[in-house]
Amino acid sequence: MTPPRALPPVWGRRAAGASALWGLILASCSLPSLLRRATEGPAGAPDPLFVLGGAAVPLVAGLAIASWAARPRPWPGLRGVLGLGGLRRSAALLPCGFFAGLAASVPMAGLFLLAQALLDPLGFAPEPQPAVAWLMDPATPPAAVAAIALAAIVLAPLAEEILYRAMLFGGLAAQGRPVRAALLSSLFFAALHLSVAAVLPLFALALLLCALWRRWGLAASFGAHAGFNAANVAVALLFS
């Protein structure tokens, strides 16, 4: 298996900086809704088109940043930067990554419970992410449930793997210190989800995704991320 092509150091810095800036923009856009939810309680069910559109924006931005970093050879360079192999290779890696993500959801759930137990004495009452809360609400219409599931399992993982693994981790790793790149990008990824109780499991998940992306490319890390999110969607629907 051919690993992703390393970005030149100067492009690595630019790609990492652009991805970090975009991640901060996304987090700042979602912060008001999280604060409103914490003070006013859950809002009504979202519009399905709004959910899909909101998930598509980071994906388009990630592809734009990756295409910019891959210049002057947009398609061959983009494949190399993202770590995309041939169709057969991707078709084989996707299901392997998916089942790895499903399996990883078990220890990650344990880390979440551990973090929650440590935070409870400090007065932290972790709120579920808005998407999880909507999935667990029996009043959420089926169309909204389907849109949230599609965004959570396909669109969001693909966007985040491009932004945080290929661009941020890959860009930082191009400076020659992949371990530091994995730690920094994983901490950034976990923090931007704006959930104190989820920082520990998401940090561990991100480290796993960095390792998968560095060794096998985008198909493996995206498959694992999709599998992890699919397990969370299934659990949320089970308890709805």
Predicted segments — roles?
Residues 48-51, 122, 140, 190-191:
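A generic short-segment signal for beta-strand/edge and adjacent turn/coil regions
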Residues 106, 133-240:
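Transmembrane helix-loop-helix hairpins at the membrane interface
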Residues 56-60, 89-96, 128, 146, ...:
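A generic structural signal for ordered alpha-helices
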Residues 116-142:
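Membrane-interface interhelical connector segments
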Residues 1-109, 113-114, 218, 230-240:
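N-terminal, membrane-interfacial amphipathic/helix-forming hydrophobic leader that caps
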Residues 99, 103-123, 150, 159, ...:
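Hydrophobic alpha-helical segments embedded in or immediately adjacent to the lipid bilayer
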Residues 40-43, 119-126, 171-179:
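Membrane interface segments of multi-pass transport proteins and intramembrane proteases
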Residues 39-41, 52-55, 126-129, 160-161, ...:
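N-terminal start-of-chain detector that recognizes signal peptides
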